[in-house]
Regions:
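Flexible cytoplasmic inter-helical loops of multi-pass small-molecule transporters
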Residues: 188-210, 406-415
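Helix-loop-helix hairpin linking two adjacent transmembrane segments in secondary transporters
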Residues: 138, 146-191
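Conserved MFS/SLC helix-loop-helix module at the cytosolic interface between two early adjacent transmembrane helices
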Residues: 69-108, 283-286
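Structural signature of the two symmetry-related core transmembrane helices
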Residues: 85-99, 290-305, 384
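C-terminal transmembrane helical hairpin of 12-TM major facilitator-type secondary transporters
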Residues: 286-338
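Extracytoplasmic gate region of multi-pass secondary transporters
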Residues: 36-40, 216-273, 336, 366-367
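Paired small-residue
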Residues: 97, 108-116, 315-323
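Cytoplasmic helix-loop-helix junction between adjacent transmembrane helices
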Residues: 113-150
Length: 423
């Protein structure tokens, strides 16, 4: 082990401006993710869909995203193509694929559009994390947390739009597509890499192997998989749970009830934006592994408790939904930061895309688990199965902390310590 080198804090005067630009772009770009899910009740009536088929409106996006991230990883595109260009082109494609939902379509065509949307979003999410990491080192946890928080609010936005009277399929879908197109312009015109760029390299078949062979990366991804097992299933089915609970409580169908359910669904997801900022701030001070453990334990507990609010007073449902929505995403950005710290700099883009690819592959399973479980045991226990994810996630993160010897930062939030390896 060589000498310890202490780097100066992040000081570039444009870093916060760039963070704001990327956060806005990520919010706008990711708004197409749940565009179909937000209007699923109307689509279900149009195509006579079963609960499982409704779930595929989200699962198909996950499938496209997995294929897209796998392609980026195998071809090393995240480390070869400039992130700005990759983001802009991908966001524009996502906008077009999503807008196609307003055409006279069949359910099969809609699924194809959702797969294409997810495929394109593979060029929006991971590159944004890499881009902001070129502007921050000492406060990278907070910066990446802001990006993940922004995309969380973006994914919730279709539910907010749908909460307004008269906002049917066409307004929700087209507003989301316009937002994604705007994101493409913002990044394409306004973004440049920061003072801490990651090394680029030519294509190499062995780069994925370099990433996967790193044990810290595998443990970080193990924790991430536990987190993802719970996250997207919660986001997909919590709005359905809320609507069913409100109906069971006796609220009559109508515009007011629709506004309540969609407004609460938006809030339960969007509160994650604040959670990601909180998580980044805490992680930079108490340690990433500490924050992840606390968030996983809290979210897993919420997944068990929320079922007991079914059919009860709306304020109780709202309280537990907001708590779950907060903790289920609070740690998400920190897994990405752990990944950027676990591989050589020239492999960061590929490491992030492989991480997200396997994570979203797992979400396809957990999303489809809930409908059959709900039919068997009802909403009271349906979400409890998701607590399995946090249990395994905590185990992986504790092993990572033991491996790295790091349970909390050894320095303040404005200092970065780099240990030089002997050659």
């Amino acid at each position: 082990m060589g000498p310890i080198v202490t780097e100066s804090p992040d000081t570039h005067p444009r870093r916060w401006q760039v963070l704001a630009l990327l956060a806005v772009a990520e919010l706008l770009g990711m708004s197409v993710w749940f565009a179909a899910s937000a209007v699923a009740p109307q689509l279900a009536v149009r195509w006579s869909l079963s609960p499982s088929e409704i779930g595929w409106l989200t699962t198909s996006v996950q499938l496209g995203f997995v294929v897209g991230t796998a392609a980026l990883a195998i071809l090393n595109l995240a480390d070869i193509v400039p992130s700005r260009a990759l983001f802009a082109v991908a966001a524009l494609i996502a906008a077009c694929a999503n807008a196609a939902l307003v055409l006279p379509t069949t359910y099969g065509f809609a699924l194809a559009c959702r797969i294409a949307t997810g495929f394109a979003l593979a060029g929006v999410y991971p590159p944004a994390m890499k881009m902001i990491a070129t502007w921050f080192r000492a406060r990278r946890g907070l910066a990446v947390g802001a990006i993940v928080g922004a995309l969380t609010v973006g994914k919730a936005t279709p539910y907010l739009v749908h909460a307004f009277p008269g906002a049917g399929v066409r307004p929700v879908v087209l507003i989301a597509s316009a937002a994604a197109a705007t994101a493409a312009v913002l990044v394409g015109v306004g973004y440049r890499d920061g003072p801490y760029p990651f090394a680029s390299r030519r294509f190499s078949w062995g780069l994925v192997g370099t990433v996967v062979s790193a044990r810290p990366w595998r443990l970080a991804v193990g924790g991430y998989l536990g987190h993802m097992f719970e996250l997207y299933s919660a986001w997909t089915w919590l709005p359905v749970f809320v609507a069913a609970s409100v109906a069971a409580h006796g609220l009559p169908p109508g515009p007011r009830t629709t506004a309540i359910t969609n407004g609460l669904s938006f809030a339960a997801i969007a509160v994650g934006g604040v959670a990601c900022l909180w998580g980044g701030w805490i992680a930079d001070r108490r340690g990433r592994e500490w924050l992840v453990t606390v968030a996983l334990a809290a979210s897993g507990t919420c997944s068990i408790l929320i079922g007991f609010s079914f059919g009860k007073a709306t304020w109780l449902v709202a309280t537990l939904a907001l708590l779950w929505g907060f903790f289920v995403i609070a740690d998400s950005a920190q897994f990405s930061v752990l990944v950027t710290e676990s591989v050589p700099s020239h492999a960061v883009g590929t490491a992030l895309t492989v991480q997200t690819s396997v994570g979203f592959l797992l979400t396809m399973v957990s999303i489809q688990l809930i409908p059959p479980i709900e039919r068997l045991v009802g909403w009271r226990w349906a979400f409890s199965v998701l607590a399995i994810g946090p249990v395994f996630g905590i185990a992986a993160v504790r092993r990572l902390a033991a491996l790295t010897g790091r349970t909390r930062p050894s320095t303040g939030p404005d200092t970065v310590v780099v240990r030089e390896r002997t050659r």
